Amino acid sequence: MTTSPGPVYETAATTDDAALTFRGVDHVSLTVTDLNVSARFYTEVLGFTVVLDFGYGLVCIHKTTGFTLSLIRHPDGTGTRFTQRQTGLDHLGLTARSRAELLGWEQRLRDLDVEFTPVRDSELGHHLNFRDPDGIALEFYAPNDRYAAALDELRSRKFSDEELLDAAEQLGLGAYVARRVS
């Protein structure tokens, strides 16, 4: 029996990658059922500060990372809890420095009565999963040393698509690596 390579994805052609790109994630907006409950969670549990209140939504900034999170309450929203099985967001992943830091977060979540799944190890690092009051899936992720080094190198210079795919294979994840159509 032969194993098939990972899925094949076609890479879109661009005329000038340097001129047409994005610099990072500006913000994430989450739809919530109760702005006050969600604001309390994101400020008390994760350390965000509410900086703008539009009535229907709040803009929160994390003072250490500068990450911007918007909490939106749609007046015609369904009021149902989040499920990652519906098309859209699966989870919001936040970076942690180490497995030890994840254990510290575990204790903080425990102290604040936030349900969580204990730290788990994966091929590329360690993760701690929990949910906000609307059931939105959140994750702290700490890359292992090998993956962290690969990420640092990726951030340090521009790579071709083929180099990125080769780097993914070198992480030992060959069966999961997407292949580009030539």
Q: What role is predicted for each listed range?
A:
Residues T68-L69, D76-T80, L112, D145-A149:
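A short local loop/turn or secondary-structure capping micro-motif enriched for an aromatic residue
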Residues Y56, F67, G88-D90, L112:
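A generic structural signal for short beta-strands and their flanking turns/coil linkers
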Residues T2-A18, G24-T33, T80-S182:
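Vicinal oxygen chelate
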Residues A19-L20, L30-P75:
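Core segments of cupin and vicinal oxygen chelate
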Residues T14-A18, G77-T83:
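Short beta-strand/turn micro-motifs at beta-sheet edges
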Residues A19-F22, V45, Q86, D111-D113:
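Alpha-helix termination/capping residues and helix-transition junctions
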